[in-house]
C-alpha cells in the first residue's frame, strides 16, 4: 500500500465522513458504518478501527462493519472488532463460503453479500448470444463471465429454473449464514421486479446448490474474491 492510499485512511478523515453523513441525513446516529475495501495493512495499523469504535462509543453509530474480500476480510472477521461483514459472494465467486462464513457466523456477525448475481454472469454464460445485453461490461464483470462460462460448460443442471436470475439469487440465499444480499440497480422498477421474483421463486433445490458448489470447487484455479 503506497503512502497516498494510507493517507486516505486516517482517524481524522473517518470522523469527518461520519459527521458529514450525520449532517446530510439529518440524524443523530447511523445504524451501521462500514470500512469499504481498505487493505489488511491499513486494518493492522488500527487507526481506522479506533475511529469506528470511538464513533460507536459516542453513540454516532449502533454497529460497525467491514466491507471487503480475501485476506483483508479474513483479518477483519478474525479481529473480533466488527459487527458485520459485507463481502462478494455469487455462483462464480464462492470463496466466502469456504473462508469467511463459518468464522463470521461463529462471531455472530451479520453477513451482507455484495454482487450476488455477479453482473448477470450466470444468465449470460448460459446463452451469451441471446443475452448479449446482460453481458458484464466492467473488468471484474468480464472475470465473472469467464468463470460462469466454464461452470456452465460442464452441462445443464437438472431442475434449474428457466429464469437464471432466480438461480443466481437463490444460490446465495440458500446459504443460511447469509443475512442479506445487495442487488444493485439504477431502476426502481427493476428493484421491485427483483423483490417480487425472489418472493415467488428464489428457493432452489439443494441438489442445484450442491452442483454449483461442486463445479466451482472443481474449476477453482485460485479464483479469489473480486472486489
Summary of predicted features, one role per range:
Residues 1, 63-64, 111, 181:
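Hydrophobic/aromatic residues located in beta-strands of well-ordered beta-sheets
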Residues 2-95, 99, 174:
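Glycine/proline-rich, positively charged
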Residues 79, 99-227:
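Structured C-terminal cap/extension of enzyme domains
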Amino acid at each position: 500500500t503506497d503512502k497516498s492510499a494510507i493517507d486516505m485512511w486516517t482517524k481524522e478523515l473517518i470522523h469527518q465522513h461520519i459527521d458529514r453523513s450525520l449532517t446530510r441525513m439529518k440524524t443523530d446516529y447511523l445504524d451501521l458504518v462500514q470500512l469499504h475495501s481498505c487493505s489488511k495493512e491499513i486494518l493492522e495499523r488500527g487507526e481506522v478501527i479506533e475511529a469506528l469504535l470511538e464513533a460507536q462509543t459516542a453513540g454516532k453509530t449502533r454497529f460497525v462493519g467491514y466491507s471487503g474480500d480475501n485476506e483483508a476480510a479474513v483479518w477483519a472477521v478474525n479481529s473480533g472488532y466488527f459487527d458485520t461483514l459485507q463481502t462478494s459472494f455469487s455462483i462464480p465467486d464462492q470463496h466466502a463460503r469456504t473462508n469467511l462464513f463459518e468464522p463470521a457466523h461463529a462471531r455472530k456477525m451479520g453477513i451482507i453479500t455484495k454482487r450476488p448475481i455477479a453482473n448477470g454472469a450466470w444468465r449470460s454464460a448460459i446463452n451469451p448470444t441471446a443475452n448479449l445485453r446482460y453481458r458484464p461490461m466492467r473488468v471484474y464483470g468480464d472475470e465473472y463471465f469467464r468463470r460462469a462460462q466454464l461452470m456452465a460448460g460442464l452441462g445443464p443442471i437438472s431442475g434449474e429454473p428457466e429464469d437464471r436470475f432466480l438461480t443466481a439469487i437463490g444460490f446465495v440465499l440458500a446459504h443460511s449464514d447469509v443475512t442479506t444480499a445487495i442487488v444493485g440497480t439504477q431502476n426502481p422498477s427493476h428493484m421491485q421486479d427483483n423483490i417480487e421474483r425472489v418472493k415467488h421463486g428464489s428457493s432452489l433445490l439443494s441438489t442445484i446448490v450442491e452442483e454449483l458448489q461442486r463445479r466451482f470447487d472443481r474449476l477453482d484455479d485460485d479464483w479469489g474474491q473480486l472486489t
